[in-house]
Amino acid sequence: MANYAIGDVQGCFFELKGLLDKINFDPAQDKLWFVGDLINRGPDSFRTIEFIYKIKDSCNVVLGNHDIHFLAIAENLRKPFKEDTLKQLLESENLNLYKKWLRNQNLLYYENIQCEDGNKIYLMTHAGIPPHWSWQDAMEAAQEIKAALSDDKLYRDYLSNIYGNLPNKSEPNLNRIDRMRLNTNYLTRMRFCKSDGELELEAKGIESDKPKGFNAWFNHPLTIKNENLHLIFGHWAALGGKTNIEKIIAIDTGCVWGYKLSAYRLEDSKVFSYDRIT
């Protein structure tokens, strides 16, 4: 048995299948950790979701910004962008099935894994963990969002109110909607921030392109860090899968942009990649 963290698939179905063949994935024994953005921008969002849903019992999934964007469009709460590739999925006879499944996924997942060099705690989110968050902060933020998304009475209200760049930092008296919008941005959109968690959400380039006064979230001292904790994230293709920090693992290697889809085996830190073919 092995655990593999998989980078942003974004509808690159054939590359996903090729990567799984390369690692000899066995759904009866292995686990896939999908870092979010399963769909959109790539050529085959429908077949990607259809396939992952079929093997869902062998998958741990966290939601990315594109997955949440899809849910909002599917509820007629948000209009598609011209570059979206969600039409076939939105017209699928199984649309409600896939919506409900995605709504019940997490924004954060963690597990203790026995590795070749000892026990490690792997924690996965789509975009990262802001530097000022403790373990409890992260758990509470993710759980509040999951509870809203999975609740038939609350999820439309959540999806209607999460878009926007403000508030851009934690404040003691934020109302529930503002708090969830900020925390959704931390978990699914963050790249650059300040040490107190103040976000800058416009810049998308490499760390050397950082806005004045901001750093990549992982280059700040992280409150959540401990000796056995390893963080896995996607979202930031411009990093090319590198943070230069041993216990912070970037796994988005830009498949949808013409580069490659990557898998990181948790037990021995080996990386496998499959080049973009479509």
Where does each model-flagged region fall?
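N-terminal active-site segment of His-dependent metallophosphoesterases
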Residues: M1-K54, I68
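Active-site environment of divalent metal-dependent phosphoester hydrolases
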Residues: C12-F14, N40-G42, D67-A72, H132, ...
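Acidic, His/Gly-rich catalytic cores of divalent-metal-dependent hydrolytic chemistry
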Residues: M139-T278
